């Protein structure tokens, strides 16, 4: 991308760093990971979890959510000002699962948020360590992306449910900062903007007064984030137009919907980071591994190496398939919800199935589910190869924007074609050619029409053996070019409900 030089790397966003060299970045990311690990160890001690219970992903999720809730200042302030019955705004908690007499039992724990904040800061050398909190948010977001389809959210804002490959990060909280903005898909940004514009249409005062000024700044900032994800001049010019509109309304909503559709072929650059559950970092720290000294990267070999040697367990419901549960978590750990299944399967070394073929529900267990028949099993999170995570969107050099199937946003920098059903996508563009942006629209449509599904993206890029940490010998896989590999295709995954 031309503007690469002006952007901070993911790791810098992740650690709030100014410009750092690679070694400093690796060290500061390592420091962040080590802090999460130390916090997790301390929480397991507080909760009296044994080693097995501490490696249970459901316990990890509860502990992670407790720390996020403890630091959610806006919500905490809101809860204190609007007390609701039976909810103590100063406390946080959730289900913790323990083995008792050969059965899994659920125990609801409650802690002072102040106490959780103290433990977190202590694990992070006295800092608030916002980067670590964001890292946990992105892990939760990646898990949601893998588990749920956002069709309902798309339909509500007037977008096509088949555009789910653009929805990465759609469940990230607003407070997730620059690192969070980097991993949001084009569809997610469009959705946020459309919601905002709709509020403005329905509420006369939304853009007015002191609050309205802040709203306007937020609107323009979101527009700029989205603009930065687009890689063609015409798409960016359209974003300028949306941003500069005096009074955003239906015309802007149409432009944004058009841009979202165009991103199925002229894909945006969306970052991918491997964020692992706290129960992976904890045991690694406990075994004496020094993340800060060794250095760590979220986009290289490190997460793969860590998963190779980690033992993580999960609770399994009676009719769930443990192998399918493993695939769900593997995809979340590798941020691969919208990657081509051909590529994921090659890297994992076992076939990765589309969501609709998986016999598994989400990882979390609802408080009303019966624990009697619930068992636990080891999650298989290892991989055969590793590959570098990308944020380019895989557009080919010829027109810097190429084939995108109606459902991929590449995660790994690995050579392949990106098959897509051009007729389906182009059909969405017939009709509405009038309007003030017809010249840019025409240019975008022309670029899309010239894109060919058989064109190869990530030319010459391959996967690497796990022993090849310096990425010296790329193994370029050959894929069946006609075969498309989209995860949510023709699917019946559950909807994500807050």
Curated annotation (Swiss-Prot):
Q: Where is this region: Disordered?
A: 1-21
Q: Which molecular-function annotation in GO is an example for this chain?
A: structural molecule activity
User: What compartments host this protein?
Assistant: Virion; Host nucleus
Q: Could you provide one GO biological process annotation from this protein's UniProt record? A: viral penetration into host nucleus
- What superkingdom does the record give? Viruses
- What keywords tag this UniProt record? Capsid protein, Helical capsid protein, Host nucleus, Host-virus interaction, Ribonucleoprotein, RNA-binding, Viral nucleoprotein, Viral penetration into host nucleus, Virion, Virus entry into host cell
Q: Where is the composition biased (Basic and acidic residues)?
A: 8-21
Where is the motif named Unconventional nuclear localization signal mapped on this chain? 1-18
Gene Ontology CC: helical viral capsid; host cell; host cell nucleus; ribonucleoprotein complex; viral nucleocapsid
Q: What is its main location?
A: virion
Question: PTMs?
Answer: Late in virus-infected cells, may be cleaved from a 56-kDa protein to a 53-kDa protein by a cellular caspase. This cleavage might be a marker for the onset of apoptosis in infected cells or have a specific function in virus host interaction.
Pfam families according to UniProt:
Flu_NP
What is the annotated quaternary arrangement, including any partners? Homomultimerizes to form the nucleocapsid. May bind host exportin-1/XPO1. Binds to viral genomic RNA. Protein-RNA contacts are mediated by a combination of electrostatic interactions between positively charged residues and the phosphate backbone and planar interactions between aromatic side chains and bases.
Function, as annotated, reads: Encapsidates the negative strand viral RNA, protecting it from nucleases. The encapsidated genomic RNA is termed the ribonucleoprotein (RNP) and serves as template for transcription and replication. The RNP needs to be localized in the host nucleus to start an infectious cycle, but is too large to diffuse through the nuclear pore complex. NP comprises at least 2 nuclear localization signals that are responsible for the active RNP import into the nucleus through cellular importin alpha/beta pathway.
What name does the UniProt record give this protein? Nucleoprotein
In its UniProt entry, the species of origin is given as Influenza A virus (strain A/China:Nanchang/11/1996 H1N1)
């Amino acid at each position: 991308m031309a503007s690469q030089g002006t952007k901070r790397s993911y790791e810098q966003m992740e650690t709030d760093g100014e410009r750092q060299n690679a070694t400093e970045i690796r060290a500061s990311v390592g420091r962040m990971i080590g802090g999460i690990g130390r916090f997790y160890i301390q929480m397991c001690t507080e909760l009296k979890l044994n080693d097995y219970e501490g490696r249970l992903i459901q316990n990890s999720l509860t502990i992670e959510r407790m720390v996020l809730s403890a630091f959610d200042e806006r919500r905490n302030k809101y809860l204190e000002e609007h007390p609701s019955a039976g909810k103590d705004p100063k406390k946080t908690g959730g289900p913790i699962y323990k083995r008792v007499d050969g059965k899994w039992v659920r125990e609801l724990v409650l802690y002072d948020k102040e106490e959780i904040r103290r433990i977190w800061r202590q694990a992070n050398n006295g800092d608030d360590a916002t980067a670590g909190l964001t890292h946990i948010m992105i892990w939760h977001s990646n898990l949601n992306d893998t588990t749920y389809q956002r069709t309902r959210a798309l339909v509500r804002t007037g977008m096509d449910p088949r555009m789910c490959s653009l929805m990465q990060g759609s469940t990230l909280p607003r407070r997730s900062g620059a690192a969070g903005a980097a991993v949001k898909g084009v569809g997610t940004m469009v959705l946020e903007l459309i919601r905002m514009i709709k509020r403005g249409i329905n509420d006369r005062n939304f853009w007015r007064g002191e609050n309205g000024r802040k709203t306007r700044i937020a609107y323009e900032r979101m527009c700029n984030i989205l603009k930065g994800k687009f890689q063609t001049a015409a798409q960016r010019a359209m974003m300028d137009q949306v941003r500069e509109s005096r009074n955003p309304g239906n015309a802007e909503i149409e432009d944004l919907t058009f841009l979202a559709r165009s991103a199925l072929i002229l894909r945006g650059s969306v970052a991918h980071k491997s964020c692992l559950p706290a129960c992976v970092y904890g045991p690694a720290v406990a075994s004496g591994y020094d993340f800060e000294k060794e250095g760590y990267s979220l986009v290289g070999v490190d997460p793969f190496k860590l998963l190779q040697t980690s033992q993580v367990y999960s609770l399994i419901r009676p009719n769930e398939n443990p192998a399918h549960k493993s695939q769900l978590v593997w995809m979340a750990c590798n941020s691969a919800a919208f990657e081509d299944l051909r590529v994921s399967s090659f890297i994992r070394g076992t076939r990765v199935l589309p969501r609709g073929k998986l016999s598994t529900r989400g990882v979390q267990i609802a408080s009303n589910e019966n624990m009697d028949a619930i068992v636990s099993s080891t999650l298989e999170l290892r991989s055969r190869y590793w590959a570098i995570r990308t944020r380019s969107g895989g557009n080919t050099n010829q027109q810097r924007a190429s084939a995108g199937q109606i459902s991929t946003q590449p995660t790994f920098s690995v050579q392949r074609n990106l098959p897509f059903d051009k007729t389906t996508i182009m059909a969405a563009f017939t009709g509405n050619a009038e309007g003030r942006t017809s010249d840019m629209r025409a240019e975008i449509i022309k670029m899309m029409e010239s894109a060919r599904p058989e064109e190869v993206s990530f030319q010459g890029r391959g996967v690497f053996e796990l022993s090849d940490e310096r990425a010296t010998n790329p193994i370029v896989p050959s894929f069946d070019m006609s075969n498309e590999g989209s995860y949510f295709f023709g699917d019946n995954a559950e909807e994500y409900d807050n």
